Amino acid sequence: MKPTLYVLAAGMGSRYGGLKQLDGLGPNGETIMDYSIYDALRAGFGKIVFVIRKTFDKEFREKIISKYEKHIPVEVVYQELDNLPKGFTLHPDRQKPWGTNHAVMMAKEVIHEPFAVINADDFYGRESYEILAKQLIAMTGTENHYCMVGYRLSNTLSESGAVARGVCETDDNHFLSSIVERTHIERKDGVIQYKDAENYWFELPENAPVSMNMWGFTPDYFEHSDK
C-alpha cells in the first residue's frame, strides 16, 4: 500500500493575509505545493489529502485540486474553529486557527494507511520525500511507529532575517526525545545563535537537527491522539 501525503493548508490565508501561497513562482506558474506534490509522487506516495478552510474552498479547488484529481486520488478535509472534541466549546472571541495536531485530526476519516504530514508553504526537497516514503512503506501493517525528517540547522537559516525552528534532541538510537521551539535564530558574529524571551543570546551547533514539520505516522495515531 502506498503512503498518503497530508498537506496542511488551512492556515494559509491567516499567515499571509490572503492566499499568496497559491501564487506561482516556477517558470510555468508552479507553487511550492506543486513542487512538493511532484517530489512526493516520484518518491512513491499514492494519495493526497489537503486540509483547508471552507472560506477558500472554491479558489483552492480551482488552482490546486483541478491539477491533480484526474491523475491521483485526492481528498479535501476542513479545519474549522468549531470542530472540537467532545466536551470542548469554542470561545466566542476565538479567531486564531487551532494548532497542527487539530489540523492533522481532521483527516482521521479519510486516511487509513501510513501517511506523511507537511506544511503547504515549505519546500522540503526530493530526497526528504524519498527517505520518508521508504520509511512509511516499511511501517505498513505496524502500529505505534512515528517518525520525523530532521534537517541540519545551518541549512535552514534565512538571509532575510531570523527564523523559528524546533530544535530536536535524539537519543543514542536516533529516537526523538525532545523538541524545543526557538523563535529567533540567526547567524550572529559568525555563529548560529538564538535569542530567548529575556533577550539573551545562546549558541546552537551548526549540525543541530531541527524540525521543519515533516512527519510520518501509522494511522493508529488518530486513535491515540483522540484519547
Regions found by a protein language model. Give the residues of each.
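Conserved N-terminal catalytic core of the sugar/cofactor nucleotidyltransferase
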Residues: 1-7, 13, 27-117, 124-125, ...
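Active-site metal-binding loops of divalent metal-dependent hydrolases
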Residues: 12, 122, 153
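Conserved catalytic-core motifs of eukaryotic protein kinase domains, centered on the activation segment
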Residues: 18-19
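Conserved beta-strand scaffold positions in the cores of enzyme catalytic domains, especially
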Residues: 22, 76, 146-148
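Conserved core of the sugar-phosphate nucleotidyltransferase
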Residues: 126-215
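Conserved nucleotide-sugar donor-binding
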Residues: 211-225
